[in-house]
Structure formats: C-alpha cells, structure tokens
C-alpha cells in the first residue's frame, strides 16, 4: 500500500512546535498557541534557523494541512476508448477529487501488449501527467500525450479547476470562470482555485492511477506549463509519489516579485479578479501591499511559507528539471535564482546534485521552445525508463 503523506501531519507538527518551544521565541509561541501554518509562516518571516530536514517536513505538513479536505471515494469512471494511429489508444476517465468535484481526464497509451511480453493482458508503464496553463484544457495537451505514448509512457491530462469541461461554459469559457472563482475566494475564503485546488486534484489523480493495472506507480512523472508548472512543483513538493517533475515557465519567487515591484505580469493572468478585489476593499491604484493581501486570501503562503524557494527543496532528491525563459516577466530572473539556489542546496545535501537542472532559455519570454521540449522528454525518459 502506498504511503499516505497526509499521515505525516501530526509528527511534523510536533517536531516543529517542539523545536520552536525550545528556541528564543518559545514563550511567545506558547502563549499564542499557533496552528501549524502560522508557525511555519513565523519561522519563514523571522528567519529562524532550524535544521533543513525539520523545516522541510514542517513546510510539507503545513501545506498538506492547508490542502486537506474531507476524503471521498474516488468513484472512478472509465468512459469511451478510441483507437488512434500507431497502435495507441485514448481513454476518457473521471474521478472524484472531493465532494462536488469530479475531475475529467484523458489517457493516451500504447496498446497493452508488447514485444517483450506479447501474452500479457497489461503492461505496467511509467506515467507522464501533463498540466495545462491558464485558459487551457486537457484536449489541448493531446498532441503531447501522443508524443509521450509513442515513447512508451502512459500520458495523462486533466482539466484544472474551472477549465475545460469543469467550466460551465466549457472550452469557450477559457479562463473567465477561473478568474471569477478566484475573486469569489477573495470574498468568501472558500476554495483555492488559484493553484492549490488543482495541486490537490493531482494528488487524487495519483490515487486513481495507483488503482490501474497498466500503470507502474513507482514511475509517475509530470510536466506542467505556466499555471500548470506552479501546480506541479506544489504537488511534487507535497507528494513524493511524483517521481520526476518538469515544471515549465512556472518556477518563481512570488515574494521577490512582490518586494521588488515585479508582480504585474503574474497578477495580469488574473487581472479582473485583482481589480475587483481592490475595488471591494476600497483600494485605488493597488500596489505591492494589496498584492500581499490578495495572495493571503486566494493562496495563503504562496509568497511566504509556500513560495518557490521553500517548496522546491522538498522535491529533493527526486529528479527535477525546471525550464524558464530568461526574460519572462511572470517569473523574474532574480526570484528564479533564489529558487535555484535553494534547490541546489537541498539536492547537494541529499547527494543528488545531478538530479536538479535549471534550464534557462536565452532571450525567451513566457514560452517553451522546441529544444526545451526535447530536453524535457529526454529528462523524463532518462529517469522513468519507459
């Protein structure tokens, strides 16, 4: 049976609280009786020096606690199967991520038999999960799924929250319902469609994939683009079942961007929600201070305890290839360097220097070049061995 990372909540919380209680801020913390997330934010804000392993365990536990919600049966359903060219097949499926949230997906894979075991009913293959960006959908990743299936993988894509079939307006809605949902989160504090909920959906997707007899659960990798890249590194930091991760044009430091007046491009992806939230709050000409308020409501900790430099080290020692554009305003280079420094330190400590690579595309903005797509595929093939 796979290890349930959510079971680590109590032990990790105990480790962090005990360490803080023995430190110079112990009396204040004991009086405040801070919950786990607040303790992790306090550590981050005050720059308290804890052993890396304890900090990482506490950060993961706090993030999992933030994501956690009542468990429901997967209630997985397999829909239509379509034969594709080159002995590939496409399978529609869905599963329950939580109450009221069914996640539709598609699988593209080679036909079950193989030259090495032609009589086998099923061949367990490695998986590549593909996560789309803002305004995208699972069907938009079909060509990439086919490419990975040709290489011997089971390619899987799902619709993110309020995207594709999960938007009332369907594909035509693009990102409008997603942006409106983020505004509703700001107003009500319910749901976290800005990255966090889809990270949870990915973890539940892995729960589903583990039930399939054509999947090798020890070899599950993922690639994500922009919003999907952020969701991927968050999910990989939280869930060690993601064996290999390739976040593309997503790795960043939200905090650095906010502190250095470089937040506009990232906020621009949800501009309508941000503007309406500022209007609700009576804020004209919103700046960095309101950006922090906005993030705290729609994705608590994304610019603090769960920022890129805090989350990437949690992926070590699993193979991690981050692909970014040198002049991408959504992932400013100085903040990206902070993420890379934190990751390199963690991978070095783990004795896995060769398992972290930052690929910076020269003179490139918010896109992934063809040569980087080749590099991503080679990375997944290298470590997942289809």
Model-derived regions: residue spans:
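Primarily recognizes the serine-hydrolase "nucleophile elbow" in alpha/beta-hydrolase
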Residues: 203-269, 300-303
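N-terminal cap/lid segment of alpha/beta-hydrolase-fold proteins
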Residues: 69-113
């Amino acid at each position: 049976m796979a290890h349930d990372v959510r079971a680590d909540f109590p032990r990790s919380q105990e480790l962090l609280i005990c360490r803080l209680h023995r430190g110079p801020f112990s009396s204040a913390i004991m009086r405040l009786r801070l919950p786990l997330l607040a303790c992790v934010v306090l550590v981050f804000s005050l720059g308290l020096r804890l052993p890396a392993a304890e900090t990482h365990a506490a950060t993961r536990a706090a993030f999992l606690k933030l994501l956690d919600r009542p468990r429901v049966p997967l209630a997985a359903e397999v829909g239509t199967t379509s034969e594709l060219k080159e002995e590939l097949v496409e399978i529609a499926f869905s599963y329950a991520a939580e109450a009221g949230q069914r996640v539709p997906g598609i699988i593209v894979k080679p036909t079950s038999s193989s030259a090495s075991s032609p009589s086998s009913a099923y061949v367990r293959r490695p998986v590549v999960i593909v996560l789309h960006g803002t305004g995208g959908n699972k069907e938009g990743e079909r060509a990439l799924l086919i490419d990975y299936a040709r290489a011997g993988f089971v390619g899987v894509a799902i619709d993110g929250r309020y995207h594709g079939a999960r938007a009332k307006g369907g594909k035509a809605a693009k990102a409008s319902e997603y942006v409106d949902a983020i505004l509703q989160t700001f107003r009500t504090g319910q749901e976290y469609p800005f990255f966090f909920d889809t990270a949870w959906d990915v973890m539940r997707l892995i729960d589903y994939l583990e039930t399939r007899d054509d999947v090798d659960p020890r070899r599950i990798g993922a690639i994500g683009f922009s919003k999907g890249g952020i969701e991927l590194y968050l999910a990989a930091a939280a869930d060690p079942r993601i064996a290999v991760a390739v976040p593309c044009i997503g790795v960043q430091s939200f905090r650095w961007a906010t502190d250095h007046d470089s937040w506009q491009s990232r906020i621009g992806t949800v501009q309508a929600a941000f503007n309406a939230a500022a209007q609700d709050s009576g804020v004209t000409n919103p700046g960095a201070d309101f950006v922090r308020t906005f993030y705290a409501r729609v994705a608590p900790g994304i610019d603090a305890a769960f920022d890129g430099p805090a989350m990437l080290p949690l992926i070590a020692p699993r193979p991690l290839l981050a692909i970014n554009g040198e002049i991408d305003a959504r992932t400013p280079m100085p903040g990206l360097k902070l993420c890379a420094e934190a990751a390199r330190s963690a991978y070095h400590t783990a004795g896995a220097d060769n398992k972290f690579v930052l690929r910076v595309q020269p003179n490139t903005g918010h896109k992934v070049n063809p040569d980087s797509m080749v590099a991503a595929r080679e990375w997944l093939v290298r470590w997942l061995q289809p």
